[in-house]
From Swiss-Prot:
It comes from Rhizobium etli (strain CIAT 652). Consists of 3 domains; the N-terminus binds the ribosome, the middle domain has PPIase activity, while the C-terminus has intrinsic chaperone activity on its own. One of its GO terms (molecular function) is ribosome binding. This is Trigger factor. Keywords: Cell cycle, Cell division, Chaperone, Cytoplasm, Isomerase, Rotamase. Residues 441-495 are annotated as: Disordered. PROSITE patterns: FKBP_PPIASE (PS50059).
Length: 495
């Protein structure tokens, strides 16, 4: 077998592979010899079929098997022998001419194919001893825990029907039909909708006009949709809602006690507070971790400058760009609304994609050298978390992970990345700094603005290697404002 490099330009490589017809024929004859005793052909005793006849009957099919095996197995072996790692699966090209293909399968012509790929750049790891980061630490007060428990209690609050007029804080159950210019609009109708007056769930002015209504009353209220309302066909327009009040209910008292905990399936009020405190700690911990990680990535980005494989950058960029456009479509906005142009946005996201890929390669190299591995238990837990997000679709999701190799990689990559960050935190200089809740949140908002209003895409581009998937924990840029999340058709129209 001859392996000839025909292109070496930057990270791009092209390899021509030639396997002489004689070698292919020898391999075919070996296969025929192995199976001759098992083949049954009418008119011949087992094992007595002449080699020439076997070759005539089965030669081409065996040669086709050999060709498939070679193009499946040899690229990996060739790259390994060259000491190279491809950024993506190598592209394989071979003749498409029917006559030439027939000659190859008949061992009358050498078998040739071409590998085209990009190599992962060699990365010489640098010392991380000079990296210094600040880990913000926040003390959670009892008052904050109580405040959050009260919010939980509000959600579990009971209501009791009353005969009087609705007041602020009362819950109103109603049917309604929304109209613009006298015509009912899509999503503007609901039956049995419940709304707590003063909750701010519906658009401005809607809830205020429910104050004073009674059960059984019919009323038409008039509101104006905000100018920046996500649904462009409603934004800034006056609308009427014909309402039939079904019930008015007064709120019960909100108390933090064992009875409340019992309603929530928790053994006691103290245990409820423990759970809430744990949730707050987790939320602040995630924010602190995110900011800590950003500091590490920023400094690694300054330390490493090298050419990145275009194929990986394109895949990452396409994923970001797709999400950005989805966000714009959902919000009904344009790039001009975000004080930019499509051209400038493309440049920014291309730069972000390059940074992500570069840092992904660096993190992958650091992790490999440090012996970081993702265990089977960690993978199973991550997949289980995915299953919990889609109840009723467990079977389809499991089948997806089994049938799509890239799906497992997309689960493994973020776990691998976080474990590399954990490793780095043991190697770098970390200083703890106590901050208040306001400082923690205010700084994060400031950083978000400084980073051109970045927001994480919901899905990453499917990467072809773990190095690329290990990508980056930072967030991809997105529009400043998103459309309000859609709830029920009724809520959506009146929010």
């Amino acid at each position: 077998m001859q392996v000839i490099e025909t292109l070496a330009e930057g990270l791009k490589r092209e390899i021509k592979v030639v396997i002489p017809a004689k070698d292919m024929e020898d391999k075919m004859n070996e296969r025929l010899a192995d199976v001759k005793d098992k083949i049954r052909i009418n008119g011949f005793r087992p094992g007595k079929v002449p080699a020439a006849h076997l070759k005539k009957v089965y030669g081409k099919s065996i040669m086709a098997e050999l060709v498939n095996e070679i193009v499946r197995e040899q690229p990996t072996a060739i790259l390994s022998s060259r000491g190279e790692k491809s950024a993506t699966q190598p592209e394989i090209a071979m003749t498409e001419d029917k006559d030439e293909a027939d000659k190859i399968l008949s061992a009358q012509q050498d078998f040739e194919f071409t590998l085209s790929y990009e190599v992962l750049p060699p990365i010489e790891l640098k010392s991380v001893k000079g990296i210094k980061v600040t880990r913000e630490v926040i003390d959670i007060s009892d008052d904050e825990v109580t405040e959050q428990v009260l919010k939980v209690a509000e959600s579990a609050r009971s209501y009791e029907s009353k005969t009087g007029k609705a007041a602020n804080g009362d819950r109103v159950a109603m049917d309604y039909v929304g109209k613009v210019d006298g015509e009912a609009f899509e999503g503007g109708t609901d039956q049995g909708a419940e709304l707590v007056i003063g909750s701010g769930r519906f658009i401005p002015g809607f809830e205020d006009q429910l104050v004073g209504v009674k059960a059984g009353e019919e009323k038409t209220i008039t509101v104006t949709f905000p100018a920046d309302y996500p649904a462009k066909n409603l934004a800034g327009k006056e609308a009427t809602f014909d309402i039939t009040v079904k019930d008015v209910a007064a709120p019960g008292a909100v108390e933090i006690n064992d009875e409340l905990a019992s309603k929530l399936g928790i053994e006691s009020a103290d245990r409820l507070k423990e759970i809430v405190r744990g949730q707050i700690e987790s939320q602040y911990g995630s924010l602190t971790r995110q900011k800590l990680k950003r500091q590490i990535l920023d400094q690694l980005d300054e330390m490493y400058k090298f050419e990145t494989p275009a194929s990986l950058v394109d895949a990452e960029y396409n994923g970001i760009w797709s999400q950005v456009n989805n966000d714009l479509a959902q919000s009904g906005k344009t790039f001009e609304d975000e004080d930019t142009t499509e051209e400038k946005a493309r440049e920014e996201y291309k730069t972000l994609a390059e940074r992500r890929v570069r840092l992904g390669l660096v993190l992958s190299e650091i992790g490999e050298k440090a012996g970081v591995e993702v265990t089977e238990d960690e993978m199973q837990r991550a997949i289980y978390d995915q299953l919990r997000q889609y109840p009723g679709q467990e079977k389809q999701i499991l089948e997806f992970f089994r049938s799509q190799p890239g799906a497992a990689a997309s689960i493994r990559a973020p776990i691998f990345e976080e474990k590399v960050i954990d490793h780095l935190l043991t190697e770098i200089d970390v200083t703890d700094k106590k901050v208040t809740k306001e400082e923690l949140l205010a700084e994060d908002e400031g950083e978000a603005k400084a980073e051109t209003k970045k927001a994480a895409p919901k899905k990453k581009a499917a990467a072809k290697t773990e190095a690329a998937e290990a990508g980056e924990g930072e967030e991809a840029a997105a529009p400043k404002k998103k459309a309000a999340p859609k709830k029920k058709a009724a809520d959506e129209s009146a929010e």
